[in-house]
Amino acid sequence: MHPYTGYAGFICGNQVQFDVSRKSFLRVINAFNKNEAAKAFLFANSPFDHMDDMALTRDYFWEYSMHGLLKNNVGIYSEEFQTEAEYCQYQEESAMFYVIRDNCYYYFKPITVKSFFEQEKFAAYSETGEICHFVPKADDFKNHRSYHYQELTKRGTIEFRSTCTQPFETTFAPIAFHLGLLANLVKLEEILESTEFFKEFGRNYSKLRRQFSRKKLSDLEQRMVKDFSKTLLDCAHEALLLRGYSEEKYLTPLYNSLIDDFGVL
């Protein structure tokens, strides 16, 4: 428990942002959207007493919070994007829930971006609870925030935001994992296209994320997700070695986590 009893709660995470080009950002989003099951298995670190079988409940709190009132505002993308137009159309169904006027914040029930800009006027609450009325402005979109696990930011970065806070000694493990896969994107795409993991479990990526967030997996699930994770780790490791900054050392705890009590992957 935290000492700030007047505050509802804190959600922590291990997040990182990397620069991407306009040419590559959709490929990055599509690829990393597909490896969330392995990330759930490798980085789950948010158990909750009332959800006994879940090693990763962080997703639940995001998806069932205010941010998840609109399905397309949080989590894993439900489709693969081929064009910028498709991506923008998807984001039109994500949420607007506040605006800034004269340096003050005003909040309202989440509404899709498309519906927000179709309004002539809207009502919002000030920080003191006063109801105010405003006209939508194009600049309001500058403050738009959706909560997907791979998010394009206005800084021209992709923010990877689905990883739980890690133990202090392994803080850089997920960062190195993301960096290595990003630096080896072509090989990552080839792995995701051919892996036996998806042939066995299908390609409903949201469902797979939940499935491999559980504490107890079947022998088949355990074996397949370990093999998939090991392949992704090798892909990241290869790229980090080529970078020449010794960043691959941060992956060692992840390799160790795949070894069982008998020293077998």
Segments and roles (model prediction):
Residues 1-11:
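Well-ordered mid-protein domain cores that form the structural environment of catalytic cofactors
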